[in-house]
């Protein structure tokens, strides 16, 4: 039921809300190579090798949809410690709610997204999920940051503690 569409969004897979059956709709799709390149630019990644989504859209509350499932992505990142490139695999669980604008205004749930023009974009949902799961300070597995200044016992390199007088016991 989702179909590729040319738009400003790097990874678009629109789904018409009124076409989703009562028992739900299974949506399995992957990003094309060009879409991976565009998403890598969007996320400032050296490379995004693949993105695959396994989603289930089910009717929810008066014309809305609940989307659950998982997203997998193979990416390359740059370590903030060694500045070396490394590959990693992301697996993200998805649970998102979409409501018509009229119901969304009256809804108590703050985490629901609006349904626009009778459709939702599963590709954008996947892109947002990846963006939220990306590590802001990626490190290669097993890599640690060792700063000798932090481990030094030299009092000249450490600023005086505001609690130094309290901690003194005479």
Could you tell me what each predicted segment is?
Residues 1-22, 26, 50, 97-170:
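Charge-rich, low-complexity linker and terminal segments
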Residues 29, 53-55, 69-71, 90-96, ...:
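A structural signal for short, well-ordered beta-strand segments
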Residues 35, 61-63, 79, 102, ...:
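Residues that cap or initiate secondary-structure elements
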Residues 64-105:
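Helix-adjacent hinge/juxtasegments
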């Amino acid at each position: 039921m989702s179909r590729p569409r040319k738009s400003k969004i790097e990874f678009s897979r629109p789904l018409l809300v009124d076409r989703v059956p009562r028992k739900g709709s299974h949506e399995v799709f992957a990003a094309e190579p060009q879409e991976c390149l565009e998403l890598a630019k969007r996320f400032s990644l050296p490379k995004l090798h693949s993105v695959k989504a396994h989603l289930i859209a089910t009717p929810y509350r008066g014309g809305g949809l609940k989307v659950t499932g998982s997203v997998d992505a193979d990416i390359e990142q740059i370590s903030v410690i060694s500045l070396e490139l490394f590959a990693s695999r992301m697996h993200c669980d998805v649970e998102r709610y979409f409501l018509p604008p009229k119901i969304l205004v009256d809804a108590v749930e703050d985490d629901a997204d609006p349904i626009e023009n009778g459709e939702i974009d599963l590709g954008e949902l996947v892109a947002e999920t990846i963006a939220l799961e990306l590590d802001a300070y990626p490190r290669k597995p097993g890599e640690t940051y060792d700063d000798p200044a932090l481990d030094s016992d030299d009092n000249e390199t450490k600023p005086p503690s505001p609690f130094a007088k309290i901690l003194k016991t005479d």
